[in-house]
């Protein structure tokens, strides 16, 4: 193999591809890229056996060939070379990387040791890259990190009536972003795949999305790259049934004001969970934290509220993460009872069609 590539373009390609590698895998080959010099391109393949990425960069190919090389080492070298172009060629069982006055040699592995890739089907439906990024960012914080129900370890993407639903839940909270649009597929995309996908689609106008015939893979593609994602098995819970529709108390809060209050309260807590009690009375909301070991705090916010006195407790971390996902300057808190789910919703829902449902906790 012998190829000449623009250094900055190669760096960008390797930066994207390394997200799909597995650095701590039992199979060392998963920490490698498969490089293929063919016709007028250098093709880079990377996989962790959940995500299969193929991305290419234009190059001057003098000799075709392919080889496996450690992904992070190659990326670090290319990133720090002080040259406009990078020259890659194989020399026995080494990959020689040259740029300017610098030369590096990395050990390689045979191309046949690299995992076989699924045949990635291009085409299908098209969604804008910005829409996908927004959807992922709105709901990824609510996705379960450790959950017996494997279906909760990913984002649920589907069309629903005249909207597209992006959904994440860990059983204690649920985030739903539902912009207007059409989408006919149902995809349950793993948490790590969302990280890979988000880096690929940021700044991209359109992304093609297809699904394998056996429904085990989703295929995302643009002219520059192709990604096959192994979908999660299982059925996502009926999330629509848990969204409350009737409320006993509603308050419109300034998003940033509540976030600052919660951050100050969190300063007294040393655990991941910090209980916050919210008490509503006429034109006043009180946020309180109390811990025998770490102290007590009380914050008051003036609000427009004329209903009956109301008291409820939350994991403050859940409130902070939900509010962080809003662009809206003001957010509705819609309460049912102290023991049932609360709905957070943007002031102008048509402008920002995003809601979060949070279960209360005893404080």
UniProtKB/Swiss-Prot annotation:
- Which species is this record about? Aquifex aeolicus (strain VF5)
One GO biological process term is: DNA strand elongation involved in DNA replication
* Protein name as catalogued: Beta sliding clamp
User: Where does the source fall among the domains of life?
Assistant: Bacteria
Query: One GO term of the cellular component aspect?
Result: DNA polymerase III complex
> Is GTP-binding among the key words of this record?
no
Note the NCBIfam families from the entry.
dnan
Single annotated GO MF: 3'-5' exonuclease activity
Which subcellular locations apply to this protein?
Cytoplasm
- Subunit relationships: Forms a ring-shaped head-to-tail homodimer around DNA which binds and tethers DNA polymerases and other proteins to the DNA. The DNA replisome complex has a single clamp-loading complex (3 tau and 1 each of delta, delta', psi and chi subunits) which binds 3 Pol III cores (1 core on the leading strand and 2 on the lagging strand) each with a beta sliding clamp dimer. Additional proteins in the replisome are other copies of gamma, psi and chi, Ssb, DNA helicase and RNA primase.
- Which key words are in the record? Cytoplasm, DNA replication, DNA-binding, DNA-directed DNA polymerase, Nucleotidyltransferase, Transferase
List the Pfam families hit by this protein, alphabetically. DNA_pol3_beta, DNA_pol3_beta_2, DNA_pol3_beta_3
Query: Which InterPro entries did the record assign?
Result: DNA_clamp_sf, DNA_polIII_beta, DNA_polIII_beta_C, DNA_polIII_beta_cen, DNA_polIII_beta_N
Q: Record's SMART domains?
A: POL3Bc
| Similarity annotation | Belongs to the beta sliding clamp family.
What job does this protein perform?
A: Confers DNA tethering and processivity to DNA polymerases and other proteins. Acts as a clamp, forming a ring around DNA (a reaction catalyzed by the clamp-loading complex) which diffuses in an ATP-independent manner freely and bidirectionally along dsDNA. Initially characterized for its ability to contact the catalytic subunit of DNA polymerase III (Pol III), a complex, multichain enzyme responsible for most of the replicative synthesis in bacteria; Pol III exhibits 3'-5' exonuclease proofreading activity.
Primary localization:
cytoplasm
């Amino acid at each position: 193999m012998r190829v000449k590539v623009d250094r900055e373009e190669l760096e960008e390609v390797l930066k994207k591809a390394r997200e799909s590698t597995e650095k701590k895998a039992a199979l060392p080959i998963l920490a490698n890229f498969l490089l293929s010099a063919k016709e007028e391109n250098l093709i880079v393949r990377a996989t962790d056996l959940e995500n299969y990425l193929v991305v290419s960069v234009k190059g001057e190919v003098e000799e075709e060939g392919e080889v496996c090389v450690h992904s992070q080492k190659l990326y670090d070298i290319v990133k720090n070379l002080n040259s406009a172009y990078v020259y890659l060629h194989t020399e026995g069982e080494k990959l020689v990387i040259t740029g300017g006055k610098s030369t590096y040699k990395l050990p390689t592995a045979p191309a046949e040791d690299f995992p076989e890739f699924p045949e990635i089907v291009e085409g299908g439906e098209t969604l804008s890259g910005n829409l996908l990024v927004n959807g992922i960012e709105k709901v990824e914080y609510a996705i379960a990190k450790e959950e017996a129900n494997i279906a909760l370890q990913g984002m649920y993407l589907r069309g629903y009536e005249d909207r597209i639903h992006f959904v994440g839940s860990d059983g204690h909270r649920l985030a739903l972003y539902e912009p207007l649009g059409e989408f006919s597929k149902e995809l349950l995309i793993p948490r790590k795949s969302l990280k890979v996908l988000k880096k690929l689609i940021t700044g991209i106008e359109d992304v093609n999305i297809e699904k394998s015939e056996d429904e085990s893979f989703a295929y995302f593609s643009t002219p520059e790259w192709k990604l096959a994602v192994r979908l999660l098995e299982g059925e996502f819970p009926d999330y629509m049934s848990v969204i409350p529709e009737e409320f006993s108390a509603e308050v419109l809060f300034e998003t940033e004001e509540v976030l600052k209050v919660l951050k100050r309260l969190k300063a007294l807590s040393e655990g991941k969970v910090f209980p916050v009690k919210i008490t509503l009375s006429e034109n006043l909301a009180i946020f309180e934290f109390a811990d025998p070991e770490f102290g007590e705090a009380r914050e008051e916010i003036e609000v427009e509220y004329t209903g009956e006195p109301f008291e409820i407790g939350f994991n403050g971390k859940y409130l902070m993460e939900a509010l962080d996902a809003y662009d809206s300057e003001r957010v509705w808190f819609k309460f049912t009872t102290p023991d049932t789910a609360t709905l957070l919703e943007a002031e102008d829902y048509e402008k920002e069609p995003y809601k979060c449902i949070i279960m209360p906790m005893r404080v």
